[in-house]
Amino acid sequence: MLNNAMSVVILAAGKGTRMYSDLPKVLHTLAGKAMVQHVIDAANELGAAHVHLVYGHGGDLLKQALKDDNLNWVLQAEQLGTGHAMQQAAPFFADDEDILMLYGDVPLISVETLQRLRDAKPQGGIGLLTVKLDDPTGYGRITRENGKVTGIVEHKDATDEQRQIQEINTGILIANGADMKRWLAKLTNNNAQGEYYITDIIALAYQEGREIVAVHPQRLSEVEGVNNRLQLSRLERVYQSEQAEKLLLAGVMLRDPARFDLRGTLTHGRDVEIDTNVIIEGNVTLGHRVKIGTGCVIKNSVIGDDCEISPYTVVEDAHLAAACTIGPFARLRPGAELLEGAHVGNFVEMKKARLGKGSKAGHLTYLGDAEIGDNVNIGAGTITCNYDGANKFKTIIGDDVFVGSDTQLVAPVTVGKGATIAAGTTVTRNVGENALAISRVPQTQKEGWRRPVKKK
């Protein structure tokens, strides 16, 4: 169906008192992303010409957190209801566009449902998203005559008979810009709350003989709002369960779907295995036959085919070629790169460092601002001393180098191809190819030496 141009209004002015937080409610995160950002992303994916964000409490924090040139910021200085919020945005509506109204604390609304609502909107009428609940207490009821929607009655204003209605308003609707502005101008606050309800436009449209079409979401969770942290945590589990199900159906082996969190996007190959309590953040790519052990965190990284990441390893902004092994308890920080077949063992940290093909750093090592060649062995306790307190410097290690345990490489320094660094050496000057570098205090031995005894 050919749709009109459309703009989106997102209501995000609420304080969120029941969150007991200094952070605006809509900035609390679900799957690692602010709730309102989920809604903004949906609006952009729908192709919104403009996104009008109605804000009130915590406006400065919102503007700091949301970096989107497509956002038009609309202040609602006083929170006098949803109709009042829409009235603040109305001057920005074009007469010939559709206006879709969303909520910043309803984060799981799907693009598919919104597109169905958009397609269903009748010419000159309103598309309304509704659901049926076994217990509709507290929600606005949908009133009908002969099956046609005639209005919405808020729970506090409803009669006993109307409170028996199970079909409720989700608050999400779409209408033409010119119609919306006209109806908004007619709203009054003559109700129990003394507020301007956007829902009153349904009755106004009906009085004009306009058609109101109700559409239901695919899942109830799509229209569930968040008022407290308990509700947020429940929606988090709903979201994570849905993501885990998609991955399982796509061939990813999740050992326990209930103990897996996806906080971004995951691109994967075949026969990927992910153990329990793994967190995927940002944009992550896993190649074929990748295995990830329990308790790992992978963020904004590319993991090549046949890599194995052992338990409790953290990988952030890193790139691993094929057949690399990492961990357990390893940390790859931004700029870490492992070439094919490289190995990083337990308690090894890398940052802005490249480890060549077949090279190994097995234990208790820090490699920062380093370029390490192929088939290099980095002994336990090796440290690249890359920082002098003001500036950082690079360490370069050629192919086939053997670095003994407890070695310090004071950058800037270069170790030539095939060189050997003896255990316990502090390297302060360049080492030539195939040379042995050794710097130790000569060992002495004192016969009959006794340890000090505590004075009584």
From Swiss-Prot:
* SUPFAM superfamilies given in the database record: Nucleotide-diphospho-sugar transferases, Trimeric LpxA-like enzymes
Cofactor binding, note field: Binds 1 Mg(2+) ion per subunit.
Give the CC-aspect GO terms: cytoplasm; membrane
In terms of CDD domains, this protein maps to: GT2_GlmU_N_bac, LbH_GlmU_C
Catalytic activity line of the entry: alpha-D-glucosamine 1-phosphate + acetyl-CoA = N-acetyl-alpha-D-glucosamine 1-phosphate + CoA + H(+); N-acetyl-alpha-D-glucosamine 1-phosphate + UTP + H(+) = UDP-N-acetyl-alpha-D-glucosamine + diphosphate
Identify the residues that bind acetyl-CoA.
380, 386-387, 405, 423, 440
Keywords for the protein's UniProt record, in alphabetical order: Acyltransferase, Cell shape, Cell wall biogenesis/degradation, Cytoplasm, Magnesium, Metal-binding, Multifunctional enzyme, Nucleotidyltransferase, Peptidoglycan synthesis, Repeat, Transferase
Q: Return the annotated region ranges for N-acetyltransferase.
A: 251-456
The cross-references to Pfam families, in alphabetical order and at most eight, read:
Hexapep (PF00132), NTP_transf_3 (PF12804)
Region described as Linker: spans on this chain: 230-250
Record-listed E.C. numbers: 2.7.7.23, 2.3.1.157
Q: Where in the cell is it found?
A: Cytoplasm
Q: Which residues bind Mg(2+)?
A: 105, 227
Q: Where is this region: Pyrophosphorylase?
A: 1-229
What residues does UDP-N-acetyl-alpha-D-glucosamine bind to? 11-14, 25, 76, 81-82, 103-105, 140, 154, 169, 227, 333, 351, 366, 377
Summary of subunit composition and partner proteins:
Homotrimer.
> What is the purpose of this protein?
Catalyzes the last two sequential reactions in the de novo biosynthetic pathway for UDP-N-acetylglucosamine (UDP-GlcNAc). The C-terminal domain catalyzes the transfer of acetyl group from acetyl coenzyme A to glucosamine-1-phosphate (GlcN-1-P) to produce N-acetylglucosamine-1-phosphate (GlcNAc-1-P), which is converted into UDP-GlcNAc by the transfer of uridine 5-monophosphate (from uridine 5-triphosphate), a reaction catalyzed by the N-terminal domain.
Q: Which family does it belong to?
A: In the N-terminal section; belongs to the N-acetylglucosamine-1-phosphate uridyltransferase family.
Which protein is depicted?
A: Bifunctional protein GlmU
From which source organism is this entry? Answer: Escherichia fergusonii (strain ATCC 35469 / DSM 13698 / CCUG 18766 / IAM 14443 / JCM 21226 / LMG 7866 / NBRC 102419 / NCTC 12128 / CDC 0568-73)
What taxonomic classification does the UniProt entry list for its organism? Answer: Bacteria, Pseudomonadati, Pseudomonadota, Gammaproteobacteria, Enterobacterales
